[in-house]
Structure formats: structure tokens, C-alpha cells
Regions:
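Accessory cap/linker subdomain of secreted extracellular hydrolases
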Residues: 142-208, 212-215
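Catalytic active-site module of serine/aspartate enzymes centered on a nucleophile-bearing elbow/loop
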Residues: 259-263, 267-305
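Short, surface-exposed "cap/lid" segments of acyl-processing enzymes
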Residues: 27, 32-62
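Primarily recognizes the serine-hydrolase "nucleophile elbow" in alpha/beta-hydrolase
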Residues: 106-161
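Alpha/beta-hydrolase active-site loop
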Residues: 88-109
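Conserved alpha/beta-hydrolase
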Residues: 54-82
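N-terminal cap/lid segment of alpha/beta-hydrolase-fold proteins
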Residues: 1-27
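Short beta-strand/loop motif that positions the catalytic acidic residue
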Residues: 221, 227-229
Length: 305
């Protein structure tokens, strides 16, 4: 199959947002917009120093083989979208949702696609849910490794479940309480071990995220939804995804037996094998991930026709 990969832009706050359009040359085809997860994750699914799984690039390439185009993007203020805003940290989660609207419009204008699906991975799932509230042009949602509970309870459970966190647990829970109440925490009050999670420059974004209940957002959504969850995900457990389906029983759910959080094939319960997958771009996506997304997009696109 002949494919085309090109740079694509969408209007940003003052400067442009940039991404990569990968498409099979098959005429009118569905397009999937891939919304990245948290932090400095780039359009390919990588981040400096620790995350080199190339999940979004691999997903785009596999979807292209299935006759589905994709756009994978850099967030405002980062990488190719660095000129979109002066400070990449000066954002709230609704800003990313607004960028999804801009991307959907740009994709439709560039490709003429009759259906644009929004795939949100991890934190990107929350962004996708927020964007879908106000966009008639989004055909449906694909929520991948996306938590179905508010972030506060998820973080508390993660902190409390690890005995190694005992020395910093009280400080962490106190910080969370303050942020949920809308109060910033100064650096002097944050244990150095916790600083990467609660940096003062990130707190505005974190506070915006803590206010959102993803299951409540999905409960009101009437378009097609696919929930993709890996059984070997160390960051978003299966029980974290289940509230999404309970909130919207019409949503489809694909449980992928060997997929971890970055959708890589992890054959055992070994922690080191799982973590090693985060830095291995040569490791394939887990069986069933692309198949589930492709089947959902094609079937739902036919139903829209």
C-alpha cells in the first residue's frame, strides 16, 4: 500500500500547532487524531530521558496498514509546537481540549475527511472527553489507558499502595488536599522526592485536572466510544477503566491481555520486563490493540455513512 506522510498545522493560541499526517492513498478514509499523554510526550509517544517506546508512531503506521489515516501531534509549547505559546507550562487542561477542536477543523480542511475520531491516551483521554463536549465534528472517541476516576483518588491510591512512600506520604496527601481546594503549594513545603510530581510551575495545570470526573463526562456522551485497556498496565489498572463503561454502557471495551500502559507486548507479570518496554521502540504493540481500534473505526464509520 502506498502511503503519504507530511507535516500538518493547526491554528494555535498565537503560533501554530504542528503534527504529522500519515495516510494511505485510498481516497476518503477515516482519520484518527492521537492526543498524547501527560508531561513532555511528543507526537511519536516519546519523552526525554525515560520514554522511548514510539507508541504513537507505531500505532499510526499500523492504522495506516488498516486503511485509516492519523494525525499525531506535539502539544502547545513543545517540540514542533514550541512557538504556539511562550511557556509550555502556562496551560490548563481546557487549553489542550481547545487545541483538539483546532486540530479537528484543520484535519477536515486538509483531508476532506467525513469522519475524524479522537484517540486520547492516558491523560489524553481526559483531554478527548473535554473536547468532545463541544465539538459536533468529532465522530467518536477512543479512550486508551484512560482512568475512569478523578485524578485525586487515583493518585492517593497509587501513593498509599506503595510501602516505599511511607516517609513522604503525609506530605504528598497534604499537597493533594491543598491543590484540590485550589490552593498552590510553595516549593519549600514540598519534599524534594515529590518535586517532580508537584513542581510549582505545574500546579496550575494539575489543579485544573483535579476538578474533572471523566466518568461523569462520558455518561452524557452519545456518540460511539471505544475503551482500550491493557491488562498489564501499571499506571491505569483495569478497575480504573471500568467506571468509564459503567458510566456509558453503550461504549465498547477492549481488554488487551498482554498490553502495558504504552501498549507494548508484555508477556509476563515481571516488573522489569514491563518497565523495559517503555524505552524499547523496537518492541511491537501488543496483539489486539490495532485490531480493536481498526474494527471499531471502520464499523462506526460505516454506520455514520
Amino acid at each position: 500500500m502506498h502511503t503519504t506522510q507530511t507535516e500538518i498545522e493547526a491554528p494555535g493560541p498565537p503560533g501554530p500547532l504542528k503534527g504529522t499526517l500519515l495516510s494511505p492513498d485510498t481516497g476518503d478514509m477515516p482519520v484518527v487524531l492521537i492526543v498524547p499523554g501527560s508531561g513532555a510526550t511528543d507526537r511519536n509517544g516519546n519523552a526525554p530521558s525515560w520514554l522511548q517506546a514510539s507508541t504513537y508512531r507505531l500505532l499510526a503506521e499500523r492504522l495506516c496498514e488498516e486503511g485509516i489515516a492519523s494525525v499525531r501531534i506535539d502539544k502547545r509549547g513543545m517540540y514542533g509546537s514550541a512557538s504556539a505559546i511562550p511557556d509550555a507550562n502556562d496551560v490548563v487542561i481546557d487549553d489542550y481540549a481547545a487545541d483538539v477542536h483546532s486540530w479537528v477543523a484543520a484535519i477536515r480542511a486538509r483531508t476532506g475527511a467525513s469522519s475524524v475520531w479522537v484517540l486520547g491516551h492516558s491523560e489524553g483521554g481526559l483531554v478527548a472527553l473535554l473536547a468532545a463536549r463541544q465539538s459536533a465534528d468529532i465522530a467518536g472517541l477512543i479512550l486508551v489507558a484512560a482512568a475512569g476516576r478523578p485524578l485525586g483518588p487515583v493518585l492517593r491510591q497509587q501513593l498509599q499502595s506503595n510501602p516505599a512512600n511511607a516517609p513522604i506520604l503525609d506530605n504528598a496527601l497534604s499537597i493533594l488536599d491543598s491543590l484540590e481546594a485550589g490552593d498552590r503549594v510553595d516549593a519549600a513545603s514540598i519534599d524534594p522526592v515529590l518535586m517532580p510530581a508537584f513542581r510549582p510551575q505545574d500546579q496550575r495545570f494539575l489543579m485544573s485536572e483535579l476538578t474533572i470526573d471523566p466518568a461523569a463526562l462520558l455518561a452524557d456522551y452519545t456518540k460511539p466510544v471505544l475503551i482500550v485497556q491493557g491488562a498489564r498496565d501499571l499506571q491505569v489498572a483495569v478497575q480504573d477503566a471500568e467506571p468509564l463503561q459503567r458510566a456509558n454502557p453503550q461504549a465498547e471495551m477492549a481488554l488487551i491481555a498482554d498490553a502495558n500502559h504504552v501498549l507494548k507486548a508484555v508477556r509476563t507479570a515481571d516488573l522489569q520486563e514491563n518497565l523495559a518496554a517503555y524505552s524499547n521502540p523496537d518492541l511491537p504493540l501488543a496483539d489486539g490493540v490495532v485490531e480493536a481500534i481498526s474494527a471499531f473505526v471502520h464499523a462506526s464509520s460505516l454506520n455514520r455513512a
